């Protein structure tokens, strides 16, 4: 049985929640997020709290309720505070430059990589080797950061590549004769 599902999600001031059937819409200062949830879970609002309640007749309703509660918490946190992922570039000539909703990356290929940001996501480059991805949707922010990292993941011998700022890359020793 899920213990996470039993904890209610606190709705902070400045955040509006509207529930219609299985569709939940959360509005805040950072934007609006809408999501349709599984039929095994009922989302209920009591004053300034949201609850994910499992429905009878579904085998995995408690597990689904825990997942829904975590997603609701991320939605409330996203529209009030937002999420961000920091990436760093390590390597000779590796550079990043934000231009509006596009990110230009020079990663040692014969051509520059241009990454178009999805709607609701902003990107900043405080320096040529740092990238900050920001947005209200936790899943999309993480996916964009993973896509950017995927162009040149850190390699284990020299550590060159695109990595998360808090990532620890395991280094290997070069083969010896």
From Swiss-Prot:
InterPro entries associated with the record: Ribosomal_uL6-like, Ribosomal_uL6-like_a/b-dom_sf, Ribosomal_uL6_a/b-dom, Ribosomal_uL6_bac-type, Ribosomal_uL6_CS
GO molecular function: rRNA binding; structural constituent of ribosome
SUPFAM superfamilies: Ribosomal protein L6
GO BP terms: cytoplasmic translation
Keywords assigned: Ribonucleoprotein, Ribosomal protein, RNA-binding, rRNA-binding
Gene3D superfamilies xrefs: Ribosomal protein L6, alpha-beta domain (3.90.930.12)
One GO cellular component term noted in the UniProt record for this chain: cytosolic large ribosomal subunit
Top-level lineage group: Bacteria
Function field: This protein binds to the 23S rRNA, and is important in its secondary structure. It is located near the subunit interface in the base of the L7/L12 stalk, and near the tRNA binding site of the peptidyltransferase center.
Family label: Belongs to the universal ribosomal protein uL6 family.
Quaternary data: Part of the 50S ribosomal subunit.
NCBIfam families: L6_bact
Protein name: Large ribosomal subunit protein uL6
